[in-house]
Regions:
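Charged substrate- and nucleic-acid-binding regions of tRNA-handling and nucleotidyl-transfer enzymes
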Residues: 117-198
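Conserved, hydrophobic alpha-helical core segments of structured domains
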Residues: 1-123
Length: 198
């Protein structure tokens, strides 16, 4: 570890009177996270968490980090307040929604960060990671692009192009994620027909 005095020069935002006490807590969290270059984003997120999303983005820009690293770290900071669902069905829905927003590796890093930050919930975050892994293995539908229908299919039924079309696809995705509809072309098109011709 660098000495706090060095960190204070490199990242002065961390050593304001309100943030300085959080530095030692951040060090303890970072020490529990996996090591290695692929994991640097989770470790940076743990360090910069007290700065919030905008402060993290600003600090990383000052350090001249790559845009990809800045985006991942700020996403991890933004999502770090995640509360894991306890019930199996709710956990599966939560895992699908997370996979809809995050790629698998950033999601794994987020869950590791959350477990390190809140060790009393580590088992719940591990269960959420297991649920996400199972969904990936099943190639479950978690994003609009994974739906069995697309915008052209909806327009063929009479849907108008534009933002409303995207909204219809997102509504179908939500129905699939929550188990109201299967991700099957026939069932999805039938639901759209009902919506277009009430």
């Amino acid at each position: 570890w660098m000495e706090p005095a060095v960190f204070a020069v490199v990242l002065p935002e961390l050593f304001t009177p309100e943030n300085a006490p959080r530095f030692e807590a951040a060090r303890a969290i970072i020490d529990t996270l996996p090591e290695g270059l692929p994991e640097v984003s989770a470790r940076l997120a743990a360090l910069l968490l007290p700065l919030g999303e905008q402060g993290t983005r600003k600090a990383l820009k000052q350090l001249r980090c790559s845009n990809a690293l800045i985006e991942e770290v700020t996403t991890l900071v933004r999502e770090a307040g995640l509360v894991p669902e306890e019930k199996t069905a709710a956990r599966a829905i939560q895992a699908r929604r997370l996979l809809g927003r995050l790629e698998p590796d950033p999601l794994r890093r987020l869950l590791a960060l959350c477990a390190a930050h809140r060790p009393e919930q580590a088992a719940a975050f591990a269960a959420l990671q297991t649920a996400a892994g199972r969904l990936q293995a099943e190639n479950a539908c978690c994003r609009v692009g994974q739906l069995a229908v697309n915008g052209r299919d909806l327009m063929a039924l009479g849907a108008k192009p534009g933002p409303g079309l995207r909204g219809q696809l997102e509504a179908l995705l939500e129905a699939v994620i929550t188990g109201q509809l299967p991700n099957e072309r026939k069932a999805l098109l039938a639901a759209v027909k009902i919506e277009l011709d009430p």
